[in-house]
Design a protein with these regions (language model features):
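Extended ligand-binding clefts on enzyme/binding-domain cores
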Residues: 1-4, 16, 23-124, 134-136
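Heptad-repeat amphipathic alpha-helical coiled-coil interaction surface used
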Residues: 3, 10-11, 23, 30, ...
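Active-site catalytic microenvironments for nucleophilic, acid-base chemistry
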Residues: 8, 12-15, 135, 188
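Long alpha-helical scaffolds in large eukaryotic adaptor/regulatory proteins
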Residues: 13-20, 193
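C-terminal capping/lid segments that line or modulate ligand- or cofactor-binding pockets
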Residues: 63-83, 120-203
Length: 203
C-alpha cells in the first residue's frame, strides 16, 4: 500500500504541484520499499508456494496470517497494490482463505476472515466482499454475495462480524464501512455485466 500511495503522490506532485524534486523522492522511496517487499515479505510456503507475509521484521521472521480489515493481503488488487493475476498474490489468496490462516473461520452459518481483536469464530463480511471484488470466478462471486445475504440476521444490512455457527449473533447492527463496500461490490458487478448472477441470488 505504501508503494502504491507514494507513486500516486509522485503523480500528483508532478502534474498538480509541479514539484519534481519531491515527486522524485516519493518515487525513489516507493522503489526502495518495493524492492524490500520482494526481498523480505515473500515467504516460500511448503503448501502454497511463494506467498506474501502479513508482517516481517527484516531479519527472516514472518507472520503468516491475514486480517479482514482493508488494507489486507486479500484486498491488494482492489487497492491497486498488485495485479490480480500476480502468481504470488494468487498463492496468497488461497492461503488466506484456508484453515492455514489462523483467522479464517468456517462454520454452518458461513465462512470468512476475521481478526485478532474480534476473537475466534467471528467472520467479517468485509472479507467476503473483498473475495468477490478480487475474483474472476462467477461461482465464487455468487457464493460470496449469497453468503452476505444469508448472514445479515434478517436485518437487511451488513454487520461488522457474524458468528460462523449462528449468524443471528453478530457485532454492530449497522456498520457503514462494510455496507458502503457492499454497495460498491453490487455496482461493480452490474458494471461488469453480472446482473444475471445477482438476480440468481436468493433471499
Amino acid at each position: 500500500m505504501a508503494v502504491t500511495t507514494l507513486n500516486k503522490m509522485a503523480d500528483v506532485l508532478t502534474r498538480v504541484n509541479g514539484n519534481s524534486q519531491m515527486a522524485s523522492q516519493c518515487t525513489d522511496l516507493a522503489n526502495e520499499v518495493k524492492a524490500a517487499l520482494q526481498k523480505y515479505a515473500v515467504y516460500d510456503h511448503p503448501k502454497y508456494g511463494k506467498i506474501y507475509a502479513y508482517e516481517v521484521d527484516g531479519m527472516g521472521n514472518h507472520l503468516l496470517m491475514d486480517d479482514a480489515n482493508v488494507p489486507s493481503l486479500l484486498a491488494m488488487p482492489y487497492l491497486g497494490d498488485v495485479d490480480i493475476d500476480d502468481p504470488i498474490y494468487q498463492n496468497t489468496r488461497r492461503f488466506v482463505w484456508s484453515k492455514d490462516n489462523p483467522y479464517f473461520f468456517r462454520g454452518k452459518a458461513g465462512e470468512g476472515i476475521g481478526g485478532p481483536h474480534m476473537g475466534y469464530d467471528m467472520a467479517w463480511p468485509m472479507s467476503l466482499i473483498m473475495r468477490a471484488m478480487t475474483s474472476r470466478d462467477d461461482k465464487e462471486i455468487k457464493e460470496c454475495v449469497q453468503m452476505l445475504m444469508d448472514t445479515d440476521a434478517n436485518t437487511g444490512v451488513i454487520h461488522e462480524s457474524f458468528d460462523i455457527k449462528d449468524s443471528m449473533h453478530y457485532t454492530r447492527p449497522w456498520f457503514a464501512w462494510q455496507n458502503t463496500l457492499f454497495g460498491e461490490l453490487i455496482l461493480k458487478l452490474v458494471k461488469d455485466g453480472k446482473t444475471d448472477l445477482l438476480i440468481s441470488c436468493k433471499k
